Amino acid sequence: MATEAAERMRKSKIICIDIETTGIDRNNDEILQVSIINGRGKTLYNSYIKPDYTTEWKETEVINKISWDCVKFAPGILTEKRKIDKILRKAGLIIGYNHKGFDLPFLAAKGIDTAVKAQIYDVMLEFSYIAVDYDEKHGNYKWKPLTYCAKYYGYTDYKAHDALEDVRATLYCYYAMQKDRKGRAAARRRKRENNE
């Protein structure tokens, strides 16, 4: 299991990644920011990314506060590909919040090599079993936003929707979950029950 292996892994081999984008469609929207820290919280990579085609994203700008002025002189994603690929290749464990379903596929769609040997730990998916909000309609536990998870574990003083702030909050939540034996035991039990 990724959790048990991660507990033994050196913090320098653990990375936490987050991106901000112009929208949620990985085939048509573009990346605006990529942030990666290691398991000690050291920033390995943090940069705005200049979109190749888009100069306006009003709906998501309201959320992430990233405007054209923030990114117009930033490097493009393909310019930064080698740096990001190198960090991902060296990782033993890649942590994120909804990165299994969003960040990693989005990066892959833009040419970043996410097919690495590292284990993947999605804090959002694991936390859904701890948060205990069952969705009868879909027959599964509801996914909660990072702000909810962070608040649950007492991490409240951060600016959500900035990739660097989000990776710091995610890493904090990851370590809090590792220490939350009662929550993890309940999560394992709920997973088994849900898969029966």
Positions of PLM-derived features:
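P-loop/Walker A phosphate-binding loop and immediately adjacent motor/lid segment at beta-alpha junctions
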Residues: 114-119, 182-184
